[in-house]
Amino acid sequence: MEQSLVNDIALQLANGKALNTDIPTALVSEAFHVTSLEAYQKEPVRIRQAVELKSETALIDYVNKFKVEGTAVFSDLDELAINVIFDYHRDAGQPRWGNHRAAYHCPFSKDWKGWQDKNKQAMNQIEFGLFLENNIHCIAAEGNAVSGAELLAMVLAFEETRKSEFKSVQRLQDGTMSFAFADEQSGGGKARLPEEITLGIQPFRNGDFYQIKARVRYRIKDGALTLWYELINPEKVIESAFNSTIEKLKTNIANVDFYEGALI
């Protein structure tokens, strides 16, 4: 009994005893737990917050409001992500917790997603024509063999070939292709499409406009026409748009460190 009491007293005396280490450490019995009283203070010791911003402007405003010495911005092209750590390490001798963070993922625009989703996807002439008609606003004013109005007229002409049998395709010197078809009622005719289309489009929502070319492809089998398009180097357009976003941040956010990299 006495020995048990002595052991309990010794345990009580040892509990909470500081140890001689580089990292502040205390010896704590399993029968005890350490409780922080920070929640009862007037304000927290440091900011512990993670937010996701939904626009470039919101990100710029937030970083400018909370940035401190050592704040770091990490840009990840692969994920189209921008991560900010406000209480990042000032240098090797001044580590910090990194508890206050902000993230922004560059969102694709509705138009870009529409063209990307249909990229290299085979369609019949009616489906292809309807897609172009619904997205005629994306046709660039410059750089095309035909104007947007001319392309729309070509697209509408394809609607008349619903029951036609396609025979051949001829490439013309003006940069268009002529599709010859036969029809029981009209006897047949020709419809045209450009070999290549130049788009003027925003890769990111509310971002800058970029031009990207799309090659028009076709296949005729048993009188049926299949059409599709192939975007030319879309990844380069995305990379350029992402780099432009980073440059905007550098222009509008001073005295922070920028790094190309991902948080792991």
Feature locations, PLM:
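Generic structural signal of hydrophobic/aromatic residues within well-ordered alpha-helices
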Residues: L5-A10, L59-V63, F128, L132, ...
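Charged, low-complexity surface segments at secondary-structure and domain boundaries
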Residues: E43-R48, W112-K118, H137-C138, L231
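An N-terminally focused, membrane-permeabilizing/fusogenic/translocator signature enriched
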Residues: M1-G93, V256-I264
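Short N-terminal edge-element motif at the start of the domain
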Residues: Y104, S109-N124
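Amphipathic, membrane-inserting segments
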Residues: V73, Y88, G93-R101, H105-F108, ...
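Alpha-helix boundary/N-cap detector
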Residues: S4, A50, K54-T57, N119, ...
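Membrane-inserting effector segments that mediate pore formation, membrane fusion
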Residues: Q121-Q173
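Intrinsically disordered, low-complexity segments used for protein-protein interactions
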Residues: N7-L11, N15, T21, I82-V84, ...
